[in-house]
């Protein structure tokens, strides 16, 4: 059984494109976390508590890139170079999404860029572009 049989996605790309970028980010957050957790289980022999600690480090790696202006600029510059025009549009829509809820340990700019990244991952996943999801996570996070 492949992923499309395990978790079928029935919506067409045109329908997915009409979704709120916050929906993409909601899915992207989950896909990103599952990818990191699976990677750690497959590549380490850590016990559950240590797995949790390590997975948090990968999430923080993304957030730290988004927190510090110089790191953020470098991350986005490198990240943007590899995106297609359509992907850049998805990132822009995710970054500009109007969310009225801000996590207490986050600032607005940090949250915007994290939402943009998660939005792209979610969008690509929903559009069944699994190879691209893997490529982005492996290149920029692992």
PLM feature segments, named:
Residues 1-142:
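Double-stranded RNA-binding/processing signature
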